[in-house]
Amino acid sequence: MPRRAEILRLPMAAPDDVSAIAASLRDGRLDPGDVVAVFAKTEGNGCVNDFTRPLAVQALRGLFGPLIGEAALGRIAMVMSGGTEGGLSPHWLVIAAREAAGPGPALAVGQARTPPLAAEDLGRRAQVEMVAAGVRAAMREAGLDAGQVHYVQVKCPLLTSERIGAALARGAAPATRDTLKSMGLSRAAAALGAALALGEVPAAAIGETVAETDPGRHARRCGASAGVELLDHEVVVMGMSPDWTGPLVIDHAVMADAIDLRPVAACLGRLGLLGPDGFVDEAGRARLAALLAKAEASADGAIRGRRHTMLTDSDIAPTRHARGFVAGALAGLVGATDLFVSGGAEFQGPDGGGPVAVIARRSGAAGPA
């Protein structure tokens, strides 16, 4: 039987505020047994010591555990992305899937988890291959082939002082001893893993470390986010399949730089969300289920020839600058601030740019966004 995906975009008052999800469970909009993934933008710093992410995971486990059983919690991918700089609004994206009759094509969703990653493998080819295997497993679960995939969301681990120390104690050498740098290395390897699984980057082009890989080789349909709250990888694949039904559709674009909105506008236009003035209008916003994007400060320190200071600010990490900057540009286009914009786009789109995915309801389709 075909399957049907649903998405609820819900507000949060704090990282541990699951009241909106709980209300959706009570009123029947959401069946706990159908939930396959929960994404969130939490109001931490998005760096190594952002504990809003594990706090949110703890709250989710406390909500769903009594409903589906502790043993079943592992089948829900909990992808927390810290950082709501600028006007970004903290929010939840709850993704569910169930059997349902009806015509396709429609949004298809699959998720998978990898084994735990050894600290010494982070940022190296072993991590790339591990994530590639996870992406392939999620594609199989969704019934998608590489050409049908529009976006892959990966949550990957980072290195802490304790994890580095444990690796050194057993005679292993991590790729870095810098915990903040480890986030970028992990995101890079995760993105290359997705690109490998999707056929965007050949295996021969990937070095033994991400530093040995040409940055011109990058994923075009992946967003990777690193966090302290896990040791493995959570992988969620989204695409369009004739074997899925329902009102949801997905499309994607790639921004060439931080202000490159034309591809995003074209994507929104293909989904019928733009008004006559070229911006998402009220009717389009009612149909917008989710927007996911990656943001990165360009390595050359400039945007279209004009200098930026995101890389030279000693007070604020460049990922935080980029997240707020790109989110503002996208929010102006769509007229909404509860967008899943994630900083740190290593090997995710071209330098300074990044992939964007838009999920929408077909015109005339009812349902909460």
UniProtKB/Swiss-Prot annotation:
Nucleotide-binding keyword on record: no
MF annotations from Gene Ontology: cyanuric acid amidohydrolase activity; metal ion binding
Catalytic residues (UniProt): 155, 225
Residue span of region RU C: 248-369
Description of how activity is regulated: Inhibited by barbituric acid.
Binding site for substrate: 53, 81-82, 187, 225-226, 323, 342-343
Domain of life of the organism encoding this protein: Bacteria
Segments of this protein annotated with the region RU A: 1-100
Gene Ontology biological process terms in this record: atrazine catabolic process
Record keywords, A-Z: Hydrolase, Magnesium, Metal-binding
Assigned EC number: 3.5.2.15
Region of interest: RU B: 106-242
Site location (Important for substrate specificity): 319
Residues holding Mg(2+): 296, 345, 348-350, 353
Pathway(s) the chain acts in: Xenobiotic degradation; atrazine degradation; biuret from cyanurate: step 1/1
Lipid biosynthesis is among the record's keywords: no
Reactions it catalyzes: cyanurate + H2O = 1-carboxybiuret + H(+)
InterPro entries documented for this protein: AtzD/Barbiturase (IPR014086), AtzD/Barbiturase_RUA (IPR043008), AtzD/Barbiturase_RUB (IPR043006), AtzD/Barbiturase_RUC (IPR043007)
Assembly: Homotetramer.
Family statement drawn from the similarity comment of this UniProt entry: Belongs to the cyclic amide hydrolase (CyAH) family.
Summary of the function given for this chain in its UniProt record: Responsible for the hydrolysis of cyanuric acid, an intermediate formed during catabolism of s-triazine based compounds in herbicides such as atrazine and polymers such as melamine. Catalyzes the hydrolytic opening of the s-triazine ring of cyanuric acid (2,4,6-trihydroxy-s-triazine) to yield carbon dioxide and carboxybiuret, which spontaneously decarboxylates to biuret.
UniProt comment concerning the protein's domains: The monomer structure is formed from three repeating units (RUs) that share the same structure as one another. The monomer, the active site and substrate all possess threefold rotational symmetry, to the extent that the active site possesses three potential Ser-Lys catalytic dyads. It is possible that any or all of the three active-site serines may act as nucleophile (albeit only one can do so per catalytic cycle).
Record's protein name: Cyanuric acid amidohydrolase
